[in-house]
């Protein structure tokens, strides 16, 4: 390792996903020098489909619309649809970096392996060049950590799981419908990814079952002819009491989607706004057509059965 290089008043930004890019851009706008470090060969973080630990799959689209996703000082192109694909989102981030001159401050294939305090309220940042295997340490006035949270997949454990004769895959390893094509599939979990995978499985697998521990509010992407987050924004602008807002949102959901229990889905055991929103236009549709069969939480595994 070489001697420590003092970068004076410069800041280091760890990660070149959306938060890392915006942090780098704002530091530069404040007149500060800054270096951005990204372990992959391109920016975008989770939205870079080809990145080593990207969790997006071929069919991934935003669950929020352009006005609620784009940077306020750099709108998404007018030609983009309401819910852009991950390819479009990644192109947007590259355009953002080009527009604000960020590429000259970004270091790719550069993995930050340690950040340690240094005398004088400074920070030593050690970076591994993944192309050469060499490390170098630079000292900064400050560090912004923007390396994301979708890194290590967690698979729950159930009794008898080690006896299961089928495949067990985490959604982190799901990239396309080829994973489920022609198979009997059980999708576990009703987060946005779980719902997306269940829908793709319904379209491509032999049979699809969907196991959830609880009921959820499955919000449509469109309500009353417009994107649902824009409809929701109109209701939120009324600044009504929380209890009344919950009544209104559940009423809108019942009018636009229906009674979940009549579809065989479990009744939510929590109130609106108490969990991360599930936005999926198609899950209830495929449940209603019998292509997705709702199931409760897993109790145990037994050989080839669950």
Show the residue positions of the predicted features.
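Catalytic lobes of large eukaryotic enzymes
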Residues: 60-70
């Amino acid at each position: 390792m070489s001697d420590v290089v003092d970068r004076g008043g410069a800041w280091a930004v760890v990660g070149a996903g959306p938060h890392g890019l915006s942090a780098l851009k704002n530091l530069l706008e404040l007149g500060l020098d800054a270096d951005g470090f990204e372990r992959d060969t391109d920016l975008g973080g989770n939205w870079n489909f080809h990145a080593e630990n990207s969790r997006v799959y071929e069919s991934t689209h935003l669950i929020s619309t352009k006005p609620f996703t784009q940077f306020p000082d750099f709108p998404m192109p007018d030609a983009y649809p309401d819910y852009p694909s991950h390819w479009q989102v990644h192109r947007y981030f590259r355009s953002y970096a080009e527009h604000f001159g960020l590429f000259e401050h970004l270091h790719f294939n550069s993995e930050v392996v340690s950040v340690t305090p240094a005398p004088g309220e400074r920070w030593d940042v050690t970076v591994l060049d993944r192309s050469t295997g060499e490390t170098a340490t630079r000292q900064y006035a400050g560090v912004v950590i923007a390396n994301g949270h979708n890194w290590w997949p967690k698979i729950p454990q159930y009794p008898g799981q080690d006896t299961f004769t089928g495949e067990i895959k985490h959604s982190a390893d799901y990239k396309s419908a080829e994973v489920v094509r022609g198979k009997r599939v059980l999708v576990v979990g009703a987060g946005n990814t779980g719902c997306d995978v269940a829908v793709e499985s319904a379209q491509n697998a032999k049979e699809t079952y969907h196991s959830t521990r609880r009921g959820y509010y499955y919000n449509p992407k469109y309500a009353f002819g417009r994107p649902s987050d824009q409809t929701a924004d109109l209701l939120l602008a009324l600044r009504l009491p929380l209890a009344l807002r919950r009544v209104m949102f559940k009423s809108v959901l019942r009018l636009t989607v229906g009674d979940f229990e009549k579809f065989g889905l479990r009744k939510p055991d929590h109130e609106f706004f108490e969990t991360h929103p599930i936005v999926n236009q198609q899950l209830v549709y495929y449940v209603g057509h019998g292509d997705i069969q709702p199931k409760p939480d897993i109790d145990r595994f037994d050989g080839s059965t669950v």
